[in-house]
Amino acid sequence: MAGKDTAEQEMSTLSTCGVNERKDVACWEDSHPEKVAWTTPVARLLINGRSLCTAWRVGPDNRMFTNNHCVESETELKNTEVWFNYQRSTCNGSMSTTVKVMGDQMLSTDYELDYTLFTVDDFAKIASFGYLGLDASEPTYGDGIYIPQHGSGNPKELAIESDQNGSGLCQIDVASANGRGVNTDTGSV
């Protein structure tokens, strides 16, 4: 099964190095408005009604990206709800209105590179959420990063700060690491 069951997610909270510095997206609006704006295309996945992951729109067309360990088959994708705007409207406040569509077609997936590219049905409902691009450049040590996510299925959160390095911000610490294959991942804090 791809993704993680809710019980498994509750037990896997030790994947954060140091203090968990994720905050509701709205908590960063005053200090990092540009990073908050870049979180709009990020969505929560509900796979087969029980597994949770994060995905994001990539490019202006009907294209979504997630990890292969989240969605690895067309059958899973057809049973995946894609939730946009699943986040708090204010810092630690009430929930925003969520927009839901279903996964539609799997365009490409790769176990070793741990990605899945797919489309959604009713694309017009989510077109206004914008999109992210892809950066083909190699990551380098010290590059700043921001991490928008639905960790553990939570309303959208954003990690910008880190207690693991001198800059106080999230950054690339290992530019080339072994993921599911040799040199297929990047280590970050």
Language model regions located:
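Serine endopeptidase catalytic core focused on the charge-relay Asp
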Residues: M1-R50, R57-D61, F65-N183
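Short loop/turn motifs that recur once per blade in beta-propeller domains
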Residues: S188-V189
